Every structure is written in C-alpha cells, then in structure tokens.
A protein has these predicted regions:
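Jelly-roll (double-stranded beta-helix
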Residues: 1-382
Length: 382
C-alpha cells in the first residue's frame, strides 16, 4: 500500500524488547526478501509452532486442452454453490501469471488459508462477509474489492448468498504508478483517495481464532500446517504491507468530451495485467459523440470483463454475472445495431470489472461447461 499504518502495541524501536519477562516475538512480513514492501508484526507466541505438516492435492484447478482462440461468453449463473472459500473455488481462466474464477461458497471455512505464491484480489459481486487476518479484521460488502497480500494468513466468513470474483496473481498487485506523485501520495484527479480504503482493525478478542490448521496454497497443491497454538496472536504491527478493501461506490469515474479508452478506468495494476472498473457515469458531452466503445483489436492483451449489474449497451445476451473474453488478434466492439441505438444516450448504469491480461488466457474445463457457444457469431446477427 502507499501509506504507513500502525495497529496495537509495538516496541519503541525495531528488533528490541520492552520487558525481558514479556518479549513480543517480532515477524518481518515482507516481499522481495528484505527489499520490498513490508510490515513488522509482534506476536505473543512463536509464529513457527507447527507440530505436523501434510500435503493435499489441489483438485479445483482443471485446465482444459481447448485450443480454439476466439471470443467467449461465460454464464456464471450456471455455476452451483460448491465447497468453501478454500476448496470451492471454480477456476475459469489462467495463464502463467494469473488465475481467475468465481467462488460461490456452500459452507463455512473450517481452517485458515495462506497463499504462498500469489497475491489475491477479490470482488464481492453479491453478499457480504468478514475477512479475519493476522493483521485484524475487515467487514466486507457488495461492491468491495479486497486485496490480500501473498503470505497473509486469513479466514473469510461469507453470507449465504455470496458470489465472489477472484484473481490470483504471481506478480504484485499495485495501485497504478501514474496515480502517485513523487512522494508516493495519491494525486488529485485519481478515481479514489486514501480515505476511501478500509484497513484491518486489530482484535481485542479474536473471534475467528478457533482453528489450528492452515492450508498453505502452492498453486497445484496445499501444505497443511497442524499448529499447536492459535495463530491470531498479534499484539500490534506497523508498516506498508497489509490487506485492505475499497468499495466501487467510493470511486469517481473519469469522463470526457469524447469516449474515454478503458485505461482511464484502471484501479489496480501489475507486471502482467491491469484491473479496471466500469461504473455509472455521464456519457461523453460532444454534441455528435458516439457514447459506446469503438471497434478495436487488442493487439497485445486479452480483455476479460465481468458484468456485475446495469445495462451494457454494446453487448447483447449479457446478464449479471456474465463474463466475456475478447482475445488478441480478433477485432471486437459493439454488436450490430448497438452504435445506432446508443446515439443520444446521456448516461450508463453499468458496473463491470475489467482485467487486461498481457499473456493469452486459457480456459478451464469448468469454463467450457458454462460457455455460450454462439457468442463468437453474435457480430454476424442483425
């Protein structure tokens, strides 16, 4: 994150103790060895107390051998509720750097999770929840983005109607660098501000601290820690690396005299992707503007769109929860009649999540089961 944060009790100086009879156990939680962003956490007990460890194969990730490159439409309302937030993830797209899918938990988690290799970005399409982490807890609501740093031990409790879009990234998930001034502060004119982010509140009592197992995700398998002490035992912490949430209702979409390209809607970025949000907003104000997207060829990216709510004028056959993938090399844009129908429109109420992947995205077997097979033909139909 771009600003310093502190919770609870920490020593006056790093790597020191306040009382010889009650030494807090310091943990450096940091990326890129000792050179990246980090926080210092102070435990009452040793965070290394693992009495046994075992391996479980990860069955959720199911790559397909489909080798057809074309535009796709997936109908995620066809996905049934499944498992919990650990074992019930339904992966849909992947490449060497990211994984994308939907979670519709049918049951509560019964252990903690820690992703050893990937950062996680969640979007709450439906429902609400509570994220409990080693840093504290964050209440979650419909429309929330949730960032969970790689290596974070967490427990996610969700409502029965929760539907969550998730992205796992092997590259760091950042705020776009162009949104920051040279001091690291968010600039004026960005779609959000520092006070829009919700940060963890450290526990006085640890309500989620009832399990001693941690599923450590290594992408294709889990290592399961069986601990002999409770894990949420932090007296305090400070630093620049921690989970956070931000709701799309707090964001201010950028508009212009003429149609604005997708990058103006960017919210998060990484070496191999960017994530943006299309939000309700006034359309362009040139008297002859065409208010929907022009035709374009994604020469260097695959364009993923998750449609959350509202009317998507440029697309036919789309419903809340639909996903489209527009691949590089094949032109896409408004479907027949959409340009003409858009003339005179003054605003849009659409809400959608966009992921631009810089490496081609592949489909899973789960994705093929919910695909609208005729979507590629939709541009040839009047």
């Amino acid at each position: 994150m771009v600003f310093y944060y502190k919770q609870g009790k920490v020593p006056e100086f790093r790597h020191t103790f306040d009382s010889k009879d009650n030494i807090l156990k310091e943990e450096l939680f940091g990326e890129e060895s000792f050179d990246g962003l980090y926080s210092l956490l102070y435990h009452f007990g040793e965070p290394t107390r693992v009495k046994d460890i075992s391996r479980e194969e990860k069955k959720e990730f199911d790559p397909s051998d489909d080798n057809i490159t074309k535009h796709r439409h997936l109908v995620t309302s066809k996905l049934e509720r499944k498992g919990n937030f650990i074992n019930g993830r339904q992966y849909l797209f992947w490449n060497n750097r990211i994984r994308i899918g939907i979670s519709k938990p049918a049951e509560k988690m019964s252990a903690y999770m820690r992703n050893a290799l990937a950062e996680e970005l969640l979007f709450f399409h439906r429902g609400k929840g509570k994220l409990s982490t080693i840093f504290g807890w964050i209440s979650l609501f419909e429309g929330d983005y949730v960032y969970i740093p790689k290596g974070t031990t967490f427990f996610l409790d969700t409502s029965e109607d929760a539907e969550i879009l998730f992205m796992e990234s092997f590259d760091r998930i950042d705020l776009p660098s162009r949104y920051l001034n040279r001091y690291g502060q968010l600039r004026e004119g960005t779609p959000y501000y520092t006070r829009d982010f919700r940060l963890p509140i450290l526990y006085e009592i640890t309500p989620a601290n009832r399990y001693k197992k941690v599923y450590v995700d290594y992408d294709t398998y889990y290592m399961v820690e069986d601990r002999d002490t409770l894990i949420f035992d932090v007296a305090g912490w400070d630093g620049y690396l921690y989970p956070y949430a931000i709701n799309i209702e707090r964001m201010a979409p950028i508009v212009g005299k003429l149609h604005q390209p997708p990058p103006v809607h960017e919210n998060f970025s990484g070496k191999s992707f960017m994530v943006g949000t299309f939000l309700p907003r006034p359309f362009d104000f040139h008297p002859r503007s065409i208010p929907i997207s022009y035709y374009h060829n994604n020469i260097d990216t695959d364009e993923f769109l998750f449609y959350s709510s509202g009317n998507f004028m440029s697309r036919k056959g789309i419903e809340p929860g639909s996903i489209t993938l527009h691949v590089r090399g094949i032109i896409h844009g408004p479907q027949p009649g959409a340009v003409e129908a858009s003339i005179g429109a003054k605003s849009t109420d659409e809400k959608a999540v966009m992921i631009e992947a810089y490496e081609p995205l592949q489909l899973t077997k789960t994705a093929l089961k919910i695909e609208d097979k005729d979507y590629m033909k939709s541009w040839s139909k009047e």
